[in-house]
Each structure stands twice: as structure tokens, then as C-alpha cells.
């Protein structure tokens, strides 16, 4: 069913995984949704930098909802395992080496969620989630100084259940993970000129702590890749830059300053090399829309709560997605 959505002028809120404000005049937009995949409820990552976990889990959830299998996964479980892994590593380093290590962080990439699921399994949301006021930034600082890793994680996030119960069936976290996300089920792609096309390479962005590899595709394939996946009923996990002046969660959409320009793969590469396109944020792409001028937009499920005109969703213009995509992850890319 086609839905018409309206956008009105409000102060700009520019947000990456952490949020800050800057005033900017925004054009009025009216969107018509042409294709919309089902999703789980919009969540809120709070002040953490866990967008990469929320977006990847949202993509997995939508895949199952489309198949008629309702599932709501625990971002806190994945986050806990990531923090645990970092903290344990620090415990077994000599102090002089540990001092040179990066601080414990919640930053990462969407593919790292899949790595952590493969290693530690999964829990569903009802069985394991933190209190709404839990501050991951404070927890990271405490873990940097503490040797009582499990005790601190239990106290801050919650005690881990040893098993998973779903629809009367008992699973281990590993068994549950395999029931919702098989190893190698998802493909990760990117597009840059400093590596050969159609080969995989570890993407050189600061948050790629696991040195995950991405298949390098031509830039001209970015948009068709997303469109084809959505039309076949598969969501796409989007990873990209949200630093542009016309990216506004408060208004519910993102555009480039020059939407009419014919952007090229060389423009993408230049922006990446000059740090104008950086790995800021992750969202789940779940639909296709157009505005009152007939311009195509992609509908994304965000993880910043529901306090915007579209109840937590955002519209990203096609030029924005072309220029500002760092990586895509999906089952049908």
C-alpha cells in the first residue's frame, strides 16, 4: 500500500553515532513509499556507538519476519561479548603494552556483528537486555580499569542466561545463532578505486577492528545492488557517512548539497581519501520511495529512537547513498 508522508521545517540535527546540533534551512519534502519490507520495532542505541550491532541485527530480523518467523535479537548480548573480548585481551597483556592499546570501545562495523555471532552465539531480546539508562560509555571506562570483567558486565548489563528458550524449544546461544544466521549467509561489499575490482580486501576504516574483508564492486553497481535486493524481498545493512549538512534525523531525511550533479566513482574515491566520506553510522535499508519531484529515496530504519517525523525511519536520496556508502551487507547482494 502506498503511503504519503509529509516533512516540515525544523531545526537541523546532525548526528553520527553520537549526536550534535547545527542550524540549517531545510526544504520541505513529501515522500511516497513505493516498496516497504517489514521490520521489527525501532530501537534506541542511546549514547553508545553500537549502531553497527543494531543495524545488522535489524537486517537479520527483517529477513526472518519476511519468511514468517518473528524474531527480536539482543544487541546487548553482542555488545557484552565484544566488550568481554576486549577486556580479556587487556588482562593478558603486559602493563607497558596495555597502556599503548586503544581504550575499550563500542565502535565497530556491521560485519563484526556477524563475527561475534559466529564466535559467541546469540540471545533474543526478551531474555537479555540492559536497563534503558545503562551507559555504555561509562562501562567502557570502568572496564579499562577493572580486572573483574564478568562481575562488572553482570552488574551493568545483566547476568547471562545459559540457554535460550524460544517457542518451547531450548537452545544454547550457538544453536540459536545458527537458527537465525548461518555462517557465510551474508555478503559484504564496498566500492573504491585503490583496490582491484571483484576482489576482497580489508577495508581501511578506523572501526574495522577485526580487519574484515569486503568484496570490491564497481560504483555503478551500488544502487542497482540495493534496488535488486529490496525488490527480491531482502533488506540491506547500510554503512556510511552522516556528516553532510543535509543529513537530519530530526527532519527524517538526507540529501547532498548538489543533488543534480553527476557524481562519479572518482568523486567517491576523492571524498574517501580526503576523509569527507567516513564510516560514521549504520542503518537498515528497508524500502524505496520518491519525493514530490519524482526523485528516488531509500527508506532506512535507524536506531536513534522514534522521535522524528517518521517514527525512527529516515529517507536517504539516491545521490546521497551513491556518494556516502562505505559498505553494504546482505543475503542477496
Over which residues does each language-model region extend?
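Sec-dependent signal peptide recognition
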Residues: 2-10
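C-terminal motif of bacterial Sec signal peptides marking the signal peptidase cleavage site
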Residues: 15-16
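N-terminal regions that are enriched for targeting/export leaders
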Residues: 22-37
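Active-site signature of cysteine proteases
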Residues: 35, 154-333
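A short glycine/serine-rich beta->alpha loop
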Residues: 37-48
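Active-site nucleophilic cysteine motif
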Residues: 46-60, 103-115, 281
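Structural recognition of the beta-strand scaffold that forms the well-ordered cores
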Residues: 50-53, 77-80, 113-115, 124-127, ...
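Papain-like cysteine protease catalytic cores
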Residues: 72-171
Amino acid at each position: 500500500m502506498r503511503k504519503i508522508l509529509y516533512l516540515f521545517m525544523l531545526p537541523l540535527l546532525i548526528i553520527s553515532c553520537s549526536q550534535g546540533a547545527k542550524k540549517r534551512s531545510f526544504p520541505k519534502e513529501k515522500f511516497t513509499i513505493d516498496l516497504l519490507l517489514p521490520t521489527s520495532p525501532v530501537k534506541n542505541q542511546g549514547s553508545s556507538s553500537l549502531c553497527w550491532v543494531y543495524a545488522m541485527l535489524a537486517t537479520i530480523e527483517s529477513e526472518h519476519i519476511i519468511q514468517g518467523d518473528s524474531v527480536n535479537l539482543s544487541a546487548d548480548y553482542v555488545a557484552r561479548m565484544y566488550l568481554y573480548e576486549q577486556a580479556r585481551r587487556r588482562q593478558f597483556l603486559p602493563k607497558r603494552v596495555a597502556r599503548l592499546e586503544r581504550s575499550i570501545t563500542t565502535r565497530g562495523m556491521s560485519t563484526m556483528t556477524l563475527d561475534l555471532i559466529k564466535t559467541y552465539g546469540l540471545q533474543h531480546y526478551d531474555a537479555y537486555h540492559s536497563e534503558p539508562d545503562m551507559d555504555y560509555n561509562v562501562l567502557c571506562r570502568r572496564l579499562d580499569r577493572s580486572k573483574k570483567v564478568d562481575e562488572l558486565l553482570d552488574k551493568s548489563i545483566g547476568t547471562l542466561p545459559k540457554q535460550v528458550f524460544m517457542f518451547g524449544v531450548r537452545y544454547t546461544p550457538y544453536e540459536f545463532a545458527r537458527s537465525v544466521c548461518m555462517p557465510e549467509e551474508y555478503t559484504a561489499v564496498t566500492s573504491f578505486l585503490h583496490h582491484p575490482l571483484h576482489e576482497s580486501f580489508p577495508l581501511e576504516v578506523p572501526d574495522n577492528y577485526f580487519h574484515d574483508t569486503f568484496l570490491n564492486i564497481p560504483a555503478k553497481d551500488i544502487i542497482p545492488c540495493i534496488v535488486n535486493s529490496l525488490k527480491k524481498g531482502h533488506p540491506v545493512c547500510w554503512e556510511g557517512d552522516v556528516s553532510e549538512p543535509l543529513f537530519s534525523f530530526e527532519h527524517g531525511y538526507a540529501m547532498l548539497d548538489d543533488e543534480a550533479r553527476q557524481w562519479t566513482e572518482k568523486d567517491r574515491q576523492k571524498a574517501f581519501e580526503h576523509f569527507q566520506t567516513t564510516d560514521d553510522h549504520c542503518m537498515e535499508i528497508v524500502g524505496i520511495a520518491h519525493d514530490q519531484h519524482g526523485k528516488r529515496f531509500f527508506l532506512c530504519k535507524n536506531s536513534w529512537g522514534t522521535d522524528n517525523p517518521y517514527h525512527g525511519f529516515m529517507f536517504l536520496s539516491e545521490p546521497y547513498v551513491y556518494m556516502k556508502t562505505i559498505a553494504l551487507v546482505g543475503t542477496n547482494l
